[in-house]
Amino acid sequence: MSNSTYAKFISKKLGGAPPLVDLNSELKTGKFILDCYHNGLINAAHDISDGGMLVALTEMMLAGNNGAEIIHPEGADPHCWFFGENQSSYIIATTKLKEIIKRSENANIPLSYLGRSSSAQELKISNGDIISLKELRNIYETGLTKQLSQ
């Protein structure tokens, strides 16, 4: 995370070379996502390369005006899990989870269950944290302005 958006704004420093890009993995994963989309299996998708999972999920929630309930894996470092800008990684929204799982296994694409969308206007994390969609929108829309004014 030494060259991530998180590192830039939180620790105020960047360090080291960025990780090497695995172009084969990028292509394979991208083709998988497109194939699922073209076959009507994905309602929405967002890569996590700019800000990490939590930023991508927030953007999806704001665009769809939906909430979400997500599972924070036990033992996972919250900073890395929420803000790690992993390559070849996407958040997808689907109502056809079993078919996505089957296709990911056949294509040898790793898949993790993050949670589910919700009609509640909030992000609920399994560790007990809850933030309203209104507050997320405010943070998202004014965050850069606040950072630049400091």
Give a label for each model feature.
Residues 1-18:
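Short, acidic (Asp/Glu-rich) active-site segment that either coordinates a divalent metal cofactor
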Residues 15-18, 28-30, 34-150:
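Glycine-/charge-enriched secondary-structure boundary and capping motifs
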